[in-house]
């Protein structure tokens, strides 16, 4: 067991394309008013995919912002841009998709950008065609077995591996990892999915089929409260939830430094709440709200 304490948490945020306008407002604030935000955290990457990407997975992408504008914003603030191409059902004929290849070629130009992948077929293709990209093993693999998770961490193909959220509190096994292994682990902090769900893979496969344009019924969640959709208050009670205080007081001390926030399929108001909860000091949250949207004339009803 190695325990080199980390001093900085790197957050990996949702909505590269989906919430481009929100980040255009938030990132200048994050740079110019660092006193608003925790000194022990930064933004490691922002991930996502535009609408109608065959290689997409996890969630149905949306957002029609120009990819060059999206990438330029990330470069301006020194943030890695990640394409979420985690479709688990890709076949050989899908590898020639022009839209996805153009995006990879663009992100490959500057270096420092990555792709979140599930399919080994796609991984090998990307390694051969876009050598400047790094790769993240997607949480859509639903790695709940600690042995499988360790095998994935040990794969040289991946810079980061996102385990299933149900491994988040398996501290005995997590603490047994080497420092090099800990550096590759990226915890999913705010999952709302039922902790005992057995249909998680089926849910992700349904999204993969939709991105491929296949005709299929929607996946109907049968978990308790599944009809309520995502609620942050509910996610906070999930046994796998990792709070900002957990990160600062537990995970950094254990030697972990990478933390993923989900939410590509949600609304921008909820994404802002995540940014407030995880990155912003409580006494400055009102300042961030006022800078982003809140003024004296705003009506809710």
PLM region spans:
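Active-site pocket-lining/capping segments in soluble small-molecule metabolic enzymes
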Residues: 1-152, 158-301
């Amino acid at each position: 067991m190695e325990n080199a304490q980390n001093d900085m948490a790197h957050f990996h945020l949702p909505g590269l394309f989906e919430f481009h306008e929100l980040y255009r407002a938030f990132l200048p604030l994050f740079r110019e008013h660092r006193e608003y935000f925790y000194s022990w955290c930064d933004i490691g990457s922002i991930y996502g995919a535009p609408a109608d990407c065959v290689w997409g997975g996890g969630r149905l992408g949306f957002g029609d912002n120009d990819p060059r504008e999206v990438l330029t914003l990330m470069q301006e603030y020194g943030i890695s841009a990640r394409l979420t191409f985690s479709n688990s059902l890709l076949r050989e004929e899908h590898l020639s998709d022009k839209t996805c290849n153009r995006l990879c070629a663009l992100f490959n130009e500057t270096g420092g950008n990555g792709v979140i992948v599930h399919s080994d077929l796609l991984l090998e293709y990307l390694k051969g065609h876009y050598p400047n990209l790094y790769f993240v093993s997607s949480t859509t693999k639903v790695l709940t077995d600690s042995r499988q998770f360790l095998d994935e961490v040990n794969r040289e193909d991946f810079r980061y591996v996102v385990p299933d959220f149900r491994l988040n509190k398996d501290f005995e096994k997590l603490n047994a990892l080497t420092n090099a292994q800990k550096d590759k682990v990226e915890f999913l902090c705010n999952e709302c999915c039922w902790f005992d769900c057995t249909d998680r893979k089926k849910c992700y496969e349904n999204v993969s089929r939709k991105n491929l344009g296949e005709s299929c019924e929607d996946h109907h969640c049968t978990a308790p409260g599944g009809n309520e959709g995502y609620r942050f208050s509910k996610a906070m009670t999930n046994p796998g939830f990792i709070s900002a205080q957990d990160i600062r007081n537990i995970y950094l001390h254990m030697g972990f430094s990478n933390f993923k926030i989900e939410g590509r399929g949600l609304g921008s108001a909820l994404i802002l709440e995540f940014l407030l909860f995880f990155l912003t000091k409580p006494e400055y949250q009102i300042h961030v709200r006022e800078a982003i949207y809140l003024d004296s004339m705003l009506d809710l009803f």
